[in-house]
A protein has these predicted regions:
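General small-molecule cofactor/ligand-binding pocket signal
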Residues: 141, 195-197, 418
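A short, small-residue-rich loop immediately preceding and capping a beta-strand
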Residues: 138-144, 172-175
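Conserved PLP-enzyme active-site core in the AAT-like
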Residues: 119, 149-315, 400-401, 428
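A generic short alpha-helical patch detector that favors 3-5-residue windows
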Residues: 213, 335-338, 381
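Conserved thiamine diphosphate
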Residues: 157-160, 169-170, 190, 345-349, ...
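Non-catalytic terminal extensions of PLP-dependent enzymes
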Residues: 1-139, 264, 314-319, 323-330, ...
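Short, glycine-/Ser/Thr-/acidic-enriched flexible segments
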Residues: 86-89, 94-96, 147, 159, ...
Length: 497
């Protein structure tokens, strides 16, 4: 860990890579287009450019070096330990990239007729069948483009279900105060009123608080299991009983499903709907602007309402069909094909026993690291955690140090920072999730470095308040960035496409 001061700070800080527009040179070329063999006459004039596109101009080597340097300024699972809580930043096995690159998948056009895409349809159908087994559900849709999209899909399914039953008076969705922010946002987008379930001091759902807001107006109760505090709801059977007695549906936010693989199935726990984040639990790529995938599983009473189109098997033949009671299409085609194929490869590669080991190692790593950090900072819950845990840096406030300062110091120590200030019910929260992929040596080193940072906060807080000193950008004005964002390079505006 390097925490330097004064002139050393700027000397040791790596430079920021200029934008691609700043290194663009008029006339530079990476490729030479092939001359048209014949005159193009079938493009209407309205689609033809009247002026050049205004693209940056570089040689291929310059472009490669530019983006390679940018990648070296970033941190990812392939370069650093990445304990970003509630995000399950596990390693993505590179062998999985070979599956969507197979010519039978890669060269397939989405408008190919069913006869010409039997292998692709079979792969997606097989993936759905495997997910049904993993989740304990009766039917699956692969259409949602992300976890939050899966949430909205599940909420629309619940709305259609109650409309079909004639229970349109069910206009409320209940969400615990520890939930992901997407839960209330998705509920609102789905046309429901959101009511909050207050947690007990331990972080678990308060049954009295649940009973207080549960009524005949309740359509859905959304629960993240395990919770964002890294706790299993100790009274979940009673929660399920009360929700079902009220005639409502139970939704599981499967963002933390990495703790359950091969151990528990949402359907067996009593949930009616669940989504799973493939980029978390099934090791498909994170971020990059997409594509993503958030498959949704449902019990049989909700299956008729799943989005169209559905892949149907008849003997050895696979067809695409629409269902009359469906909520309709929620996106184009059958989902994010490259992501879904990677997730299928992951399930096939691990098998049932391998999936169980994934969760057991995730639980082991989280509890080992939590035990190593015991007594350093206050934590949430007592006893064992699940796949992640939450610490609070509130005790350091008397020294002028907050969670964000610890996170900045963690960057200087050579890691990606944990999630901070979430869950909202924990002051100065640091949410740490090591995943199953990390070695004991990595966890030991992280624990030692975090311990040194906390001791530094107690003895020399000024040093920590200057961190990070090893990154291109230190401490941007976050308020100004939020209120006056500059999202486009001024040089790009001058060359607007």
């Amino acid at each position: 860990m390097s925490l330097t001061t004064g002139d050393e700070k700027q000397k040791n800080r790596p430079g920021m890579e200029p934008s691609i527009w700043e290194i663009s040179r008029p006339g530079a070329r990476g490729v030479r287009p092939v001359s048209r063999p014949v005159e193009v006459t079938d493009l209407p004039p309205s689609l033809c450019r009247k002026s050049p596109a205004g693209l940056p101009e570089l040689s291929e080597l310059e472009a490669v070096r530019h983006f390679t340097r940018l990648s070296q300024l970033s941190r990812g699972v392939d370069t650093h330990f990445y304990p970003l809580g509630s995000c399950t930043m596990k390693y993505n096995p590179k062998v999985m990239d070979r599956v969507p690159a197979l010519s039978g998948f890669q060269d397939l056009h989405p408008l190919t007729d069913e006869e010409g895409m039997q292998g692709y349809l079979e792969a997606l159908w097989t993936f759905s069948e495997l997910l049904k087994e993993v989740l304990g559900m009766d039917a699956i849709t692969l259409a949602p483009a992300a976890g939050a999209h899966g949430e909205l899909t599940g909420i629309l399914l619940a709305r259609k279900y109650f409309e079909k039953k004639g229970e349109t008076f069910r206009t409320e969705i209940l969400v615990p105060d520890s939930a992901h922010g997407t839960n209330p946002a998705s509920a609102s987008m789905g046309g429901f009123t959101v009511r909050t379930i207050v947690s007990k001091p331990s972080g678990h759902i308060d049954l009295d608080a649940l009973t207080e807001v549960l009524s005949e107006r309740t359509a859905l109760v959304m629960i993240t299991a395990p919770s964002t505090l890294g706790l299993f709801e100790e009274e979940l059977p009673e929660v399920v009983r009360r929700v079902k007695a009220a005639g409502a549906l139970l939704y599981m936010d499967g963002a933390n499903m990495n703790a359950f693989l091969g151990v528990l199935r949402p359907g067996d726990l009593g949930f009616d709907i669940v989504h799973i984040n493939t980029h978390k639990t099934l090791a498909t790529p994170h971020g990059g602007g997409g594509p993503g995938s958030g498959p949704v599983g449902v019990r049989s009473h909700l299956a008729p309402f799943l989005p169209n189109p559905r892949i149907v098997r008849s003997g050895k033949t696979f067809t695409v069909a629409d269902q009359p009671d469906s909520i309709g299409r929620i996106r184009s085609f059958h989902g994010s094909s490259g992501v879904l194929l990677r997730a299928l490869a992951y399930l096939r590669m691990l098998g049932q026993d391998g999936l169980r080991r994934v969760s057991l190692y995730a639980l082991l790593n989280a509890n080992y690291l939590r035990k190593k950090l015991e007594g350093l900072l206050p934590g949430t819950g007592e006893g064992l955690c699940t796949h992640e845990f939450v610490l609070s840096a509130r005790s350091l406030e008397k020294k002028g140090v907050r969670a964000i300062d610890l996170a900045k110091g963690i960057l200087d120590a050579g890691y990606y920072a944990p999630t901070i200030y979430f869950p909202l019910i924990v002051p100065e929260a640091l949410m740490i999730e090591p995943t199953e992929c990390e070695s004991r040596a990595t966890l030991d080193k992280f624990a030692d470095d975090l311990t040194r940072l906390v001791r530094l906060a107690e003895t020399e807080p000024g040093k920590l308040l200057r961190a990070p000193e090893s990154t291109p950008v230190s401490r941007p004005d976050e308020v100004k960035a939020a209120r006056e964002p500059v999202l486009v390079d001024p040089a790009a505006v001058e060359n607007r496409i």
